[in-house]
Amino acid sequence: MLLNIRFILKMLGAMFILETFFMLLAAAVAFFYREGDEWVLLLSAGILALAGVLCYGIGFRANEYNVGKREGMLIVTLTWTLFSFFGMLPFYLGGYIDNVTDAFFETMSGFTTTGSTILNDVEALPKGILFWRSLTHWQGGMGMIVFTVALMPIFGGGATLLYDAEASSITHERFRPRVTQIAKRLWGVYVFLTLLVAFLLYLGPMDLFDAVNHAMSTIATGGFSTKNASVGYWDSPYIEYVIATFMCVGATNMTLIYFCFQGQFKKLFRDEETRWFYAIVLVAVLTTAAYLYMKGIEMDVEKAFRMAYFQVSSIISSSGFCTANYISWGPFFWCLALLLMFVCGCAGSTSGGLKVGRIMILAKNLFNVFKKQTHPCAVIPVRVNGHVVSNEVVHKVLAFTFVYLSLLLFSCLVLTLDGAGFEEAIGAVFASLGNVGVGLGSIGAVGNFSELSDFSKWYLSFLMMTGRLEIFTVLTILLPSFWKQ
């Protein structure tokens, strides 16, 4: 069957038009502060609006019945790619980032909530551009498709296809019958949490602008800051505890948080993946705090705990905020950081990585394999939350993990061939595919990605999008069979 190009253009046009309003919001902030960036944001919004009207006009009479999974996957992949292209215009046209490669990398990092940056002096940017930079995080956190499905009824029956293609986690199937309804509710929770974090940060030493920007980055588990020293700029225990806590909230399954808003707290506490996630956080924090104290890196017990809590929360939630140069903590924490980058948060959250849910299924399946060594005739299914996980799901998890690991190893080879150092290559690949944002070596806590080659930046941009869309959506499009009739 031929691809329904008109439908694809119609959907892209609708999303471009909606995205225009977000860019106009950044322009409004720019007009408020009057730092010279207002017109470039208006111009960029105009270009985006024109592209949206053209695409929507061409696809206006699209046949919505002739739509399948191929259209869904292509729309989602094109959305993230083209949003990054149009989203980079304020950076590039305004001269704040002087080449296309860096501008695209920065914007893709924003929309995918990776948080990697090529900027050496973030504080030199005007406030409208800084707000747009944080806003890319906030949109990408819950998923741009999910947001558009929530607000625009034109998607109709195509909503489920798009939702499946973008939110391809292992736990979202329960909501398929009411995709539009659920998308609206999830975004309601998302907005409330963002406002709550902004309010709490404003109660501390942050001004309103910084509080709003960091609230968007925190709930989206993104990591973009308005300061060169990231959250460490304020040197405030209160700020660090608030952000660390809500980074973990952002890494929790958002649907379970929604149930909490309905008063169904038991669903959160009884969920195995959530318990595994917070158990991992607890063990990692206590281990790191003990390590920092015993090694003499930090002799104050409370500060050792706070540093460990913040940095572990930042990495496992795939946020990438920093309050300390963890590279100076030694190889032990580097290895722990890589493990946390690999695992990351829960399915259905704003975080990246392999997800705790998959790790849990892999661990239970491995345990069953050992059991069958002594009881070969036993039928021992994998169970999650008391329910049997089908063999199909287990096989998908195994396949996903294999592809994820293969892509990690292959990508490390690619970057080292391009001249990156060993530590930098490993750190950059883990940070990009897991959407974590911070790596090792010169691209660690106090470094950035500016020294990498243009090829490496384009390749890492591809990894960011691939990781954000959970690999299969993007890689399937690269298969020749995808394009066959």
Where are these regions (language model features)?
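Membrane-proximal intracellular helices of multi-pass ion channels
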Residues: 1-485
